[in-house]
């Protein structure tokens, strides 16, 4: 049997081909280290699989920062994260890397970031209005379209990696530790993203995926927000995850996808997939979530949650969907990417008939200051933990 049918991204296919090698060749990247003594840890914010995260103070200017101390992993992976963060610095809604220092105790690298008030999306988004959801989804799309245009897939889009300062309506896409450069025809590791947000391509072991993986993950976030069901696809393991998806999208389209790309399904699926019809999105609407659902929301969701990665909306196409007409209209009127606090109700009657332009947000200002940790006393002291890691 011949192997899987190759696939290439529909957009930004060759951006890395047209850039100098040093842009994407992260293994050759030379890291410029800042001064660890500029930083003093204040409290622990959380821990992840690959890092521990602290709130800290840059003692040269008294500004709050966030310090991500990386756990011992391959130098190659650390260099990849640093190179990607440097390439994306200043992009819309991308967390700003301010400095890189070495933890004086473990000698492992520590990344210093701009501080964002620490409400993670997961805690916040079950309280959001219809307008809020549209607003923040649009802000995430700005970050995704930007990183994709720069030849980079995030590969770990999920609520935990979206930081929102709701008071100032400021959003940042964080944790670029799994992000990777897109090269057409390259086969990638499918062990990326978090289970509930893994695209079908990962679950069926199709390695020639692209930026569209991030759009599936975004669709999972949207579904959980508008239906108030967290997570929306709740698999108990990676095999069950595909079953949960098939119970909503149906098995017929799944097999069409498998056939189109000549994918060989793991035999373990034989006993668990079964046969399922495609469900209408309306069946997930009930009295508790109907205020968040609209025809345009369901149409938008339907265009993201597609088995075939090539059929999903791109980030730029998504920004032009009628679901965002009220946001585009307001941002054009305000001439700004940050709306004032408000939770304007949205009705289909308020939809514009078309979009003339999508405003480009101004880049984030540079962070004053430099690297990561001052530690003779601080690192040795117990640090109180806070809910919700920032990085």
UniProtKB/Swiss-Prot annotation:
Domain of life: Eukaryota
Domain Protein kinase: 39-324
Ranges of Polar residues composition bias in the record: 335-346
Protein residues bound to ATP: 45-53, 68
SUPFAM superfamilies per the UniProt record, alphabetical: Protein kinase-like (PK-like) (SSF56112)
Stretches for region Disordered: 335-363
GO CC annotations on file: cytosol; nucleus; protein kinase CK2 complex
Low complexity bias spans: 347-357
A Pfam family matched in the record: Pkinase
Record key words, sorted: ATP-binding, Biological rhythms, Kinase, Nucleotide-binding, Nucleus, Serine/threonine-protein kinase, Transferase, Wnt signaling pathway
GO biological process: double-strand break repair; positive regulation of aggrephagy; regulation of cell cycle; rhythmic process; Wnt signaling pathway
Similarity-based family: Belongs to the protein kinase superfamily. Ser/Thr protein kinase family. CK2 subfamily.
Stated name of the protein: Casein kinase II subunit alpha
Organism for this UniProt entry: Gallus gallus
Gene: CSNK2A1
């Amino acid at each position: 049997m011949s192997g899987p049918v190759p696939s290439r991204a529909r957009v930004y296919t060759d951006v890395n081909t047209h850039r100098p090698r040093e842009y994407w060749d992260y293994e050759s990247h030379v890291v410029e280290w800042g001064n660890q003594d500029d930083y003093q840890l204040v409290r622990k914010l959380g821990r992840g699989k690959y890092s521990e995260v602290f709130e800290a103070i840059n003692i040269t200017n008294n500004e709050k920062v966030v310090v991500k101390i990386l756990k011992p992993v391959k130098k190659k992976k650390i260099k990849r994260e640093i190179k990607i963060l440097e390439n994306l610095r200043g992009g819309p809604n991308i967390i700003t890397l301010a400095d890189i220092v070495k933890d004086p105790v473990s000698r492992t690298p520590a990344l210093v970031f701009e501080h964002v008030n620490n409400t993670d999306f997961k805690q916040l988004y079950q309280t959001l209005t219809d307008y809020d959801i549209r607003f923040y989804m649009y802000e995430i799309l700005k970050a995704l379209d930007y990183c994709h245009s720069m030849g980079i897939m995030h590969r770990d889009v999920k609520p935990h990696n979206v930081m929102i300062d709701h008071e100032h309506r400021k959003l940042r896409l964080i944790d670029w530790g799994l992000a990777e450069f897109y090269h057409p025809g390259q086969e990638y590791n499918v062990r990326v993203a978090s289970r509930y947000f893994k695209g079908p391509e990962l679950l069926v072991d199709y390695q020639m995926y692209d930026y569209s993986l991030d759009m599936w993950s975004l669709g999972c976030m949207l579904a959980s927000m508008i239906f108030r069901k967290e997570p929306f696809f709740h698999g108990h393991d990676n095999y069950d995850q595909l079953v949960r998806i098939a119970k909503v999208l149906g098995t017929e389209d799944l097999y069409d996808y498998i056939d189109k790309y000549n994918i060989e399904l793991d035999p373990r699926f034989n006993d668990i997939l079964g046969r399922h019809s495609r469900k209408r999105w309306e069946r997930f609407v009930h009295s508790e979530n109907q205020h968040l659902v609209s025809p345009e929301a369901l149409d938008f969701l339907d265009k993201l949650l597609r088995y075939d990665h090539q059929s999903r909306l791109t980030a730029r196409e998504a920004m032009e969907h009628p679901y965002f007409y009220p946001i585009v209209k307001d941002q054009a009127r305000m001439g700004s990417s940050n709306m004032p606090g408000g939770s304007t109700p949205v009705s289909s009657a308020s939809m514009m008939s078309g979009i003339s332009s999508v405003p480009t947000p101004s880049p984030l200002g540079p962070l004053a200051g430099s690297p990561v940790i001052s530690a003779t006393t601080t690192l040795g002291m117990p640090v109180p933990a806070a809910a919700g890691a920032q990085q």
